Structures are given as C-alpha cells and as structure tokens.
Regions:
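Short N-terminal binding/cap micro-motifs at the start of the first secondary-structure element
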Residues: 12-17
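Cofactor-binding loop segments of dinucleotide-utilizing enzymes, especially the Rossmann-like FAD-
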Residues: 7-9, 34, 92, 174
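Acyltransferase
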Residues: 178-231
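Pocket-forming structural segment of enzyme catalytic cores
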Residues: 99-181
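Extreme N-terminal starter segment of soluble prokaryotic enzymes
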Residues: 1-5
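Catalytic nucleophile loop
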Residues: 79-104
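Flexible gly/pro-rich beta->alpha loop and the following alpha-helix that scaffold active-site loops
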Residues: 23-88
Length: 231
C-alpha cells in the first residue's frame, strides 16, 4: 500500500475532495503540520511514495510574507525531485515546487478567485485533464515554472494554472479539490484576507458540482502518472 507525505501550511487548507479519491484507491497519506508548536518539516525518509505540498492561505514565498519553513520545504522538495519521487504542489505548494526545480516565484498580492482554467496540451495528465475546469485560487505570490516545464493549463490571463516537470512532478495554482468551507475557514483563520471575498465564496459554492466532476479525471491522470496504483 502506497504512503504519501502531505504538508499543510494552515489548519483550514487540506486535501479536501482529493482525500476520497486517494482513500478509494487505498493510497494512504499522513499530514504534517510544521506551523504548529510541535510541528517540523518532515525528513526525506518520511516522504514515502510521494510528497504533496498544500496551499498557504496568506503565506507566500516571494519575500513579502514567506511561510516560515520555506527554506526547509524547498530543500525537502528538491531532495524528493532528485530522487525521482512524485510531487504535487498546490497554491503555495506549487511555488515551492517551482523553487525546488530551478524555477522561481513572482510577488503578487493575496487573492481569492474562482475562474476557469483551459487545457493547452491535449495529452495533459495522460490525456485525462478536462478541456476546461474550475480553478479556485487562494494564494499570495505566483509560481514561475522552470523553462523545461510543460504548461498543462492556463488561467484567463494566460498565466500557468497547471504545469508538469519531468514525468511525475505537478504544480497547480488552484486547489482541484477545494471546498467553500475550506475558503471560509481560511478567511476566519487569519487577520489578513483577500479583498471582498464574498463573491468568490458564492461562486465557489455554486461551482461545487463542477469541481467534483472535474476532479475525477484529474485524479485519474495524477494517479496514473505518479504510479501510486502500481505495486
């Protein structure tokens, strides 16, 4: 049975709808919470069969409000990448993936948007990525994938919404399994919130079925390319 290492950066942001897809395939995962008093960034030995780096709420990586464990997490992601193990980065996690794989980040204010991402590679996620999908983004700063990365999908402004590095490393600016309750908890968890989050919350709530439907092929492609179902 596969075992994944999942790093949280806030109490509110977790795997969300992705949990059911992993559990349904008997893929185990363990949350690590470096932001708690007793929490630390896990050692490489704890990565197991793959690393998932989640979003950071108001935390970023471009220097304005860096997540406190940024250096350690970039080092862990780099070691995981160099070992050939799969990595999934979401939001802040995608920024960490970019930094660990010779990309960069650019400064951007904390934003909360629910827009449509558009696939740009027909074979994205082994052909399973939907042609378009709802892309809920709650993030400060933005990942800039390395030049050798493959852009899988773009946001309405043309910036990357999803990218792939090598065979089994992926970054998503939005959370493919985001729930309205998670966004509400992020708003309540921190003093700093995106401006006027109400409309985005409503839009996220109305899109819940579309998000759940798109997640089915997205997870199918991720699991296939990461090999998490192979013995």
């Amino acid at each position: 049975m596969k075992q994944l290492c999942v790093i949280q950066h806030t109490s509110a942001d977790y795997l969300g709808l992705m949990e059911d897809h992993l559990e349904g395939r008997r893929i185990r995962f363990h949350y690590h919470r470096p932001f708690t008093e007793a929490g630390i960034v896990p050692p490489f030995e704890a990565v197991g069969d793959g690393l998932i780096l989640l979003g950071g709420g108001p935390w970023g990586s471009a220097g304005t409000r860096d997540v406190p464990t940024l250096k350690e997490e970039v080092a862990l992601a780099r070691a995981t990448f160099m070992s050939g193990l799969p990595i999934i980065g979401i939001g802040l996690g995608a920024q960490i993936v970019a930094l660990a794989c010779d990309g960069s980040v650019e400064e951007a204010p904390l934003t909360f948007s629910v827009e449509t991402a558009t696939r740009v590679q027909d074979d994205a996620l082994a052909g399973f990525m939907p042609e378009s999908y709802v892309n809920p983004v709650y993030m400060r700063d933005r990942p800039v994938p390395p030049d050798y990365a493959t852009i899988l999908a773009t946001e309405p402004d043309g910036r990357p919404a999803a990218f792939q590095i090598g065979d089994n490393v992926f970054g998503f600016t939005g959370h493919p399994g985001f729930k309205r309750a998670m966004a509400e908890d992020l708003v309540m968890e921190f003093e700093e919130v995106p401006p006027s989050p109400g409309p985005a919350l409503d839009k996220l709530g109305m899109a819940k079925h579309d998000i759940a439907d798109a997640l089915v092929p997205i997870m199918t492609g991720i699991v296939k390319l990461t090999g998490w179902m192979r013995e």
